C-alpha cells in the first residue's frame, strides 16, 4: 500500500477527527453509501434533509472492516463512529459539483454549511483556524518522528511519553498549540523547543508567591547540580519556569529576576508542560510548569486551585487507594499569590503564570522491580512508520485470541486499580490514557500494575466520605454532592477514552472487545453482592453514554470552564450528548438500545 505524503497524512488526521465529531455531536446526520464495487462510504448531510440522496454532503471512505461496527436505524447512523474507521479520500458534494478536500479549514467551512443550528461566523472562523493550527503542528510532529527508533520494555518512560505523536485520539484540536496574550506566537518550527525545553530559573519575592510543601528543600539539589545561584536575601525564592513562559512571568510578577537559563537538561512528557529531568542529574521529581498556551482544549497554565488536588491526595485521599495502585505524589508546589488580594478571576489569571509542581518520579522504583513504566495512551497509538499499535508490537499480539487474552489481563488489572476507591469512598480518578501508566515486567511481559497521576481532575463525593466519618471542606478541589457527575466523568475518561481507545485500536470492537470489558467490570465490582457497586455498574451499563461534545463546547464558549461543584441541582449538559452505550455492543440489549435511538421524525 502506498503511504501518502506527510502533509496529506497530517491533514487527514484532523479531517477524520472532525468528521466523526460533527456526526457524533449531532451537528449533522450520517448514513452509509456503496458505489458499485467500492468499499462503503460514510455520507454526512444536514439534519433537516429528508431525501435518500442529499444534494449537498460530505463523503469519506470507510476502512474495509469498519462497516460492521457502524449501526443504522431509519437509514441514519445512530452509533458512535470513530476516526479509526475512516480512510481517504474525502469528497465534498454540492449538486453536480464534486471535489476532494483534506485541508481542515476548507473542510470545516463546507461542513459548517450543513449545520442547522446557528453559530456565530466569528466562532466558526476561530474553529477553522484552530483546525488549521492542529494540522500544521501534526505535520511537524510527523516530520520529527518519521523514522522513530523502536520502543521496547527497556525504553525509558519519557520515550514512551513521546510515542503519543498523534495526540488526543478523537479531538479535532488534537495538536493545537496557541500562544496566549503575552507570549510570542507559537509556530510548528518551535516544536523542538517544546520537546526539549530550556529551563529558566527566576528569583521572586516570597510575598508574591504561595508555597505548599517542602518546595525549596526539594528543589535545592537540582539548583546545586545546575549551578543556579541561591537567592541573595531570605525574602526571595528561586522558581523554575519554561523559557518560553518568561514574558508572562515578568508581566505578572514585577519582582521576578532571571537568574539562569539551562538547556539540554530535561524532556517534556505527553502533556507538553511536565518535564522529566535527564538521568545524570539524579533528580527524584518531575517538574510540572505553567505554559500560557492553549494545548488541545485548555490553556496549560497552572491555576492555584489546581495545585490543591495533589495536596488533598497527599494528605488524605491516598489512604483510600488500593494498596497495589501506585500514584505520583505531588510533594510541593508554587503558585502566584495574587488570589490573596481577592479571589477574583483576574487575580487567578495572573497567579497561574508561575505555577510549578514537584511530582515524584517513580522510574527508579519501577527499575528496582525490573518493570517498565509505559504511558497507557501510547499502547493504543501507532508509530509513524508502522500500521501496528505499540501494544501489538511490544506484547506480540498477532491474532484475535492473543489480543483477547492481553485485553482481559489489562482490563482486569486496571479496573481493580481504579474502581474500589470510587465504589467505597466516592473518589473518582481521571485515569484517561494520558493520566495513567502501565507497569510491565521486563522478563515476562506481564502487566504488574498501574500508576495514576495529575490529580487536578480528581472528583470526590463528600457525602460518601462523611458517612465514613471523614470530613472535607466543600470548597476543596473536586468536591461535590453530585455522585452521578463523578460517574459520568469516569465513564468518559476510563471507558470511552482509556479502554475504548484500546478496543478500537486493536480492532476488537468487532471481536468481543466490549464483552471482555463488561465481564471484567462485573468481576471487579461484584454488583450482585454490593448495593453501591450495583448502582455504579448499572450506571456504566445504562442504555446511553454521555459523549463529550468538544465542538459544541467551543461554540457555546463552554470550553473547559466548568471546574466548580454541582451541589444540589444538575447542570445543563451542554457539553454532552447521549449516544448508544458502546459498552453494550454485542450484548442482548444492544439491538433494543439501537431501536430506541432511531430518529423519531426528520425535520422538514
From Swiss-Prot:
Pathway the protein contributes to = Secondary metabolite biosynthesis
Pfam families linked to this entry: FhuF, IucA_IucC
Stretches that traverse the bilayer: none
As recorded in UniProt, its EC number(s) are: 6.-.-.-
> Which EC class is the enzyme in?
ligase
Q: Which UniProt keywords apply?
A: Ligase
Keyword Ligase in annotation: yes
Which transformation does this protein catalyse, written as a reaction? Answer: cyclo(L-arginyl-(Z)-dehydro-4-O-homoseryl-tyrosyl) + citrate + ATP = NK13650 B + AMP + diphosphate + H(+)
A GO molecular function held by the record: acid-amino acid ligase activity
Q: Which InterPro entries match?
A: Aerobactin_biosyn_IucA/IucC_N (IPR007310), IucA/IucC-like_C (IPR022770), LucA/IucC-like (IPR037455)
Q: Which GO terms describe its biological process?
A: siderophore biosynthetic process
Q: What does this protein do?
A: NRPS-independent siderophore synthetase-like protein; part of the ank cluster that mediates the biosynthesis of NK13650 C, a highly modified cyclo-arginine-tyrosine dipeptide. AnkE is responsible of the production of NK13650 B via ligation of citrate to the ankD product. Within the pathway, the cyclodipeptide synthase ankA acts as the scaffold-generating enzyme and is responsible for formation of the cyclo-Arg-Tyr diketopiperazine (cRY) from L-Arg and L-Tyr. The ankA product cRY is desaturated by the cytochrome P450 monooxygenase ankB to yield a dehydro-cyclodipeptide intermediate.
User: What name is this protein filed under?
Assistant: NRPS-independent siderophore synthetase-like protein ankE
Annotated source species = Aspergillus thermomutatus
